[in-house]
Amino acid sequence: MITSNSNISMYLSLSMSKKLENRVAVITGATSGMALATAKLFVEEGAYVFITGRRQEMLDKAVKEIGKNVTGVQGDAGKIADLDRLFAIVKNEKGRIDVLFASAGYGELGKPLGSITEKGFDDTFNVNVRGTLFTVQKALPLMKDGGSIILNSSIAGVKGFPGTSVYSASKAAVRSFARTWTAELKGKIRVNVITPGTIDTAMFGGLTQEMKDGYVSIIPMGRMGKPREIAAAALFLASDDSSFVTGIELLVDGGTAQV
């Protein structure tokens, strides 16, 4: 079999091409865990990323870990002024957004009915619901047709876990946003939701071993997920691999929601 040099070059080009080559991504709440893993993978796949975080020290550390093609912008997704500053920086530096991953979130676990406070409720909905909505709304002027919006939900919005009333409701609202925005942006920008199950991140660090074992016991795969596994799902939704996918809820939960 004789293969021309041009065919070899074409094959090598396709096999070595990166899924997010020359794309601009914004990832909120990306100083640790799933969002940081996603930022790293996006850069590996050719993207330039803007990441946000509330604490400057953690943000600086994340930028250093990512290593290249990244700008860190200190800010709180629940504060409108911080969002305005974020997107002004993105506009000034890159002029556009190809991928938006609204990942910033907040939640108190282990808060059953009777122990919920007004502050806990307000803080959770301010970041998870209000923050998600205005993150997307303020990003839209910089997004072009063909762009991808990814929202971060949670298995808690699908299943009924004791002690998660407020957090679960906030994440169910995120799922609802995706349905509505898919209808509003149809044919232009894709909107999808990633719904992680129990992932081995700092969010679960404050739980007792008994509580952790309880979560793992209901996962058919018998383990917590890894941040990189969420990143891989985000890469799929960000890239052209999902060009005909919009409005979905991609459950990355080891099968928890199915049993």
Describe the predicted segments one by one.
Residues 24, 31-32:
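Conserved glycine-rich cofactor-binding loop
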Residues 154:
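Residue(s) in the substrate-gating loop at a strand-loop-helix junction
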Residues 141, 182-187, 243:
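Alpha-helical segment proximal to the catalytic Tyr-Lys
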Residues 114-134, 150, 170, 174:
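Catalytic Tyr-X3-Lys loop
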Residues 111-113, 117-125, 204, 211, ...:
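Substrate-binding pocket helix/loop in short-chain dehydrogenase/reductase
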Residues 136-137, 179:
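A short, exposed helix-loop element centered on a Lys and neighboring polar residues
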Residues 142, 223-252, 257-258:
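C-terminal substrate-recognition "lid" of short-chain dehydrogenase/reductases
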Residues 7, 11, 15, 107-110, ...:
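Short C-terminal tail/terminal secondary-structure segment
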